[in-house]
Amino acid sequence: MDINASRALANVYDLPDDFFPKIDDLVRDAKDALEPYWKSDSIKKHVLIATHFVDLIEDFWQTTQGMHEIAESLRAVIPPTTAPVPTGYLIQHEEAEEIPLGDLFKHQEERIVSFQPDYPITARIHAHLKAYAKINEESLDRARRLLWWHYNCLLWGEANVTNYISRLRTWLSTPEKYRGRDAPTIEAITRPIQVAQGGRKTSSGTRKPRGLEPRRRKVKTTFVYGRRRSKSRERRAPSPQRAGSPLPRSSSSHHRSPSPRK
């Protein structure tokens, strides 16, 4: 990957959360962008990675939504005097990446017991589900940003998306009173290129070529008694004839020829 594209991809993680579409909208848009490539069995890098994240997000999203629904249904059977487990006792996403998946439940259970040894069983299940759902949501957020990057590279081209992320980051980091009211859009960035390409084919005007070209001598014309003569043409040798005078006769023609009538 190009170094500028790699830097832009890293900057995607710093963009605001509300910049990206919701999960449902994102997956639908990504599938629309990927469908032509799926039909042609394309093995482009962006196609393969975006397809992977579409499948991953759909599975994780459904699982996470199920966790939230079960956790909410357990609230009715948790004793009302039960205090919720503080956030500090719940495993965070960064910690979960260092813990083997099979040991995740054991580590979370130990933390709940350290908070309150006789914590109610329904409240424990609720705490587990909330912790796992939070971990999944953070993983989904990273996957969502990566999916956005890859399917937009298919739509607009990697170079255009890289340029767009750079401009957007600059706009976001500029104080509000020194920047434009509206954030840059990728459509506005790519539009001049599309207009230039189309205009080159349909333009009927003349366009000055770039670079050096031989200078052309202007052709001046003059009008002599209704006839146009180009001054650039090679001029004939001067003659004693003046404009409007009869043609001069040769010396041999000074004597009149004998008249046919006598």
Swiss-Prot record:
- Protein's UniProt keywords contain Phosphoprotein: yes
Q: What does this protein do?
A: Self assembles to form an icosahedral capsid. Most capsid appear to be large particles with an icosahedral symmetry of T=4 and consist of 240 copies of capsid protein, though a fraction forms smaller T=3 particles consisting of 180 capsid proteins. Entering capsid are transported along microtubules to the nucleus. Phosphorylation of the capsid is thought to induce exposure of nuclear localization signal in the C-terminal portion of the capsid protein that allows binding to the nuclear pore complex via the importin (karyopherin-) alpha and beta.
Q: Which gene encodes it?
A: C
Span list, region RNA binding:
254-260
Which protein, by its recorded name, is this?
Capsid protein
**From start to end residue, where is composition biased (Basic residues)?**
215-234, 252-262
Pfam annotation, one family: Hepatitis_core
Quaternary data: Homodimerizes, then multimerizes.
Q: Which domain of life is it from?
A: Viruses
GO MF annotations for this entry? DNA binding; RNA binding; structural molecule activity
Question: Region Disordered: what ranges?
Answer: 183-262
Q: Which UniProt keywords apply?
A: Capsid protein, Cytoplasmic inwards viral transport, DNA-binding, Host cytoplasm, Host-virus interaction, Microtubular inwards viral transport, Phosphoprotein, RNA-binding, T=4 icosahedral capsid protein, Viral penetration into host nucleus, Virion, Virus entry into host cell
Q: Which InterPro entries match?
A: Hepatitis_core, Viral_capsid_core_dom_sf_HBV
